[in-house]
Amino acid sequence: MPYRSTEILSPGPADKAPLHRVTLTHDQRHLRRKLLHLENDDVVMLDLKEAVMLADGDLLALEGGGYIEVKAAEEALYEIRPRDRLHLIELAWHLGNRHLAAAIDEGRILIVRDPVIRAMLEGLGATVNEAVEPFHPLRGAYHGTGHHHHGHGHDPHHG
């Protein structure tokens, strides 16, 4: 019989040691109701009231007690290196303008591999290398609402 979870907890004290783990890509971590396959081949039915974006280390609280830890899977990414700090801002702007998920550090940006975007970035003077690591992009401005609203076409001042 599968486990069932209807509650997500942020990583906490050691007294919440997980029974098992589930490893998910960035896209797989955005969900509401799904049967998840654990690393030990058990399954857990995640059944939430609304869609969430799970983070690495989050805990799925199991009915009847216990926790399942969420781990971010390693993914095929591009590591983008700018010439300098101002160039990093310019590159981040171009990626944001295309609504791409991005993890931004002080000296690099990570995105999911896309050859068209790679060519654009190299054309803008960036150094782009392949990387394989967990992907933790920034959460968007609309993250807390459970759904995504842009308002495109509704704001006469939107560019």
From Swiss-Prot:
Keywords linked to the UniProt accession: Chaperone, Cytoplasm, Nickel
An example Gene Ontology molecular-function term: nickel cation binding
Origin: domain of life: Bacteria
Annotated family: Belongs to the UreE family.
Official protein name in the record: Urease accessory protein UreE
Residue ranges of the region described as Disordered: 140-159
Annotated localization: Cytoplasm
Pfam families reported for this sequence: UreE_C (PF05194), UreE_N (PF02814)
Role this protein plays: Involved in urease metallocenter assembly. Binds nickel. Probably functions as a nickel donor during metallocenter assembly.
Cited Gene3D superfamilies: Urease metallochaperone UreE, N-terminal domain, UreE, C-terminal domain
Species, as recorded: Sinorhizobium fredii (strain NBRC 101917 / NGR234)
Gene: ureE
GO CC terms, sorted: cytoplasm
Any one GO biological process: protein-containing complex assembly
